[in-house]
């Protein structure tokens, strides 16, 4: 076995199937997941945790130590992968300007433990602690606290028998969720090691890898197919779950259930546009009014009219933006690009075409979301201009080679279409 993995959240069924097939031992399953796979709940400590990102369930986080990185890239070939350059629970020292590397540090402690990696450009610290997969130990008021997942009173009393003696010596102990699944002897030895490490300041090897994966629609659809092999699953299950959790559960009680009504309900008169960059950061583009839509069991197509106001020039096209200019753009669940046709507000003449290459767009309530693949194409006065290919190569550190190759393949396809006057 490669390691013990705990999986939580809306992707749990599909990921349990996938990581089981990759020789990981699945532990701490919910009763529902154990029953689906006709197994007993495996109450053992986890080496790695995979779960929904609490701020956006369109992303997953992976935490722990093990050789999972390559498998993550292979499982999520068409998604963005961010690995923290600083390990979770590692001990770092901020400089005088309250930074560490290129990241701002908050609060500005001279030394502290990383409790939030810098996925938003900021490291959050807490006071220095010795950390294992079972517990945290540090000097303080001599109290014991528990993970929110340890809520059984009998279990808390069991753990208190071990931590109370340390509390009386002035050590704080926080029990992590894994502690529920270890023996008293394992936990006792672990606490002894943590105290020694804390007093000797041995933090060099402390910390856990942290990955943030922004899931694409193609990878969600793959997870749909995996889940479908285990339990009744409609197409777009994992996408729809982000907006309609209970409604999807209700729909799937009917084996002939169709996602069309839920897909239609996601489309409002005006749609926002969430344009996600390779490092996982979102840019919100000017949204647009829906002027045409088509939804069926196989997918969806939405055409927007976006009003373009302000000064400046149109990106890639180079023509000045004038009052009343507008963009007509189609988002198609089958296409890895969107064609923006920019028109003059004065005489409705075509000013130019800009093609954004991205993963196929997904729908959330009143919002279109896609992963931007950096490389784009502009058509200016019949000239074809390939934009930001160097950015694609630079940002490839966040992508599987399959996604990089797909972006270049789509760009070449579009160039051929333009040259043959077959752009649709």
UniProtKB/Swiss-Prot annotation:
List the keywords (alphabetical).
Endonuclease, Hydrolase, Nuclease, RNA-binding, rRNA processing
Question: What EC number(s) does its UniProt record assign?
Answer: 3.1.26.-
- Which branch of life, at top level? Archaea
Q: Does the keyword Transferase apply?
A: no
State the InterPro entries in the record.
DUF402, FomD-like_sf, Ntdp-like, RNA-bd_FAU-1
Q: Which GO terms describe its molecular function?
A: mRNA 3'-UTR AU-rich region binding; RNA endonuclease activity, producing 5'-phosphomonoesters
Alphabetical list of SUPFAM superfamilies matching this protein: FomD-like (SSF159234)
PANTHER family documented for this protein: PTHR39159, UPF0374 PROTEIN YGAC
Role, per record: Probable RNase involved in rRNA stability through maturation and/or degradation of precursor rRNAs. Binds to RNA in loop regions with AU-rich sequences.
Q: Which HAMAP family match?
A: RNA_binding_AU_1 (MF_01910)
The entry sums up its family as follows: Belongs to the FAU-1 family.
Question: Which protein is depicted?
Answer: Probable ribonuclease FAU-1
């Amino acid at each position: 076995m490669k390691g013990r993995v705990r999986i939580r959240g809306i992707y749990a069924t599909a990921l349990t199937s996938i990581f089981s097939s990759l020789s990981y031992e699945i532990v701490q399953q919910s009763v529902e997941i154990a029953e689906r796979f006709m197994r007993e709940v495996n109450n053992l400590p986890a080496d790695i945790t995979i779960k929904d990102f609490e701020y956006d369930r369109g992303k997953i986080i992976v935490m722990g130590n093990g050789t999972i990185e390559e498998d993550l890239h292979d499982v999520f070939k068409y998604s963005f992968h961010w690995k923290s350059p600083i390990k979770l629970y590692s001990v770092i020292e901020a400089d005088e300007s309250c930074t560490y590397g290129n990241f701002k540090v908050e609060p500005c402690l001279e030394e502290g433990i990383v409790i939030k990696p810098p996925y938003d450009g900021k490291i959050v610290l807490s006071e220095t602690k010795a950390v294992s997969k079972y517990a945290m130990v540090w000097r303080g008021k001599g109290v014991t606290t528990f993970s929110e997942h340890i809520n059984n009173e009998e279990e808390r009393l069991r753990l208190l028998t071990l931590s109370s003696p340390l509390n009386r010596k002035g050590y704080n102990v926080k029990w992590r969720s894994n502690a529920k699944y270890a023996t008293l002897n394992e936990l006792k030895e672990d606490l002894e090691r943590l105290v020694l490490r804390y007093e000797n300041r041995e933090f060099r090897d402390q910390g856990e890898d942290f990955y943030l994966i922004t899931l694409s629609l193609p990878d969600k659809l793959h997870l749909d197919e995996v889940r479908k092999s285990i339990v009744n699953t409609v197409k777009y299950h994992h996408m729809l779950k982000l907006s309609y959790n209970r409604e999807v559960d209700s729909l799937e009680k009917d084996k002939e259930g169709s996602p069309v009504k839920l897909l239609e309900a996601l489309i409002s008169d005006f749609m926002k546009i969430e344009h996600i960059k390779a490092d996982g950061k979102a840019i919100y583009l000017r949204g647009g009014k829906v002027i045409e839509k088509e939804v069926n069991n196989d997918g969806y197509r939405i055409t927007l009219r976006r009003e373009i106001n302000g000064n400046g020039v149109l990106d890639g096209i180079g023509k000045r933006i004038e009052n009343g200019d507008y963009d007509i753009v189609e988002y198609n669940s089958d296409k890895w690009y969107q064609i923006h046709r920019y028109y003059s507000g004065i005489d409705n003449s075509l000013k130019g075409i800009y093609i954004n290459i991205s993963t196929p767009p997904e729908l959330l309530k009143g919002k279109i979301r896609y992963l931007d693949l950096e490389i784009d194409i502009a058509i200016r006065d019949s000239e074809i201009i390939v934009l930001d290919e160097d950015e694609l190569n630079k940002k490839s550190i966040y992508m599987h080679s399959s996604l990089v190759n797909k972006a270049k393949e789509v760009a070449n396809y579009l160039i051929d279409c333009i040259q043959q006057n077959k752009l649709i």
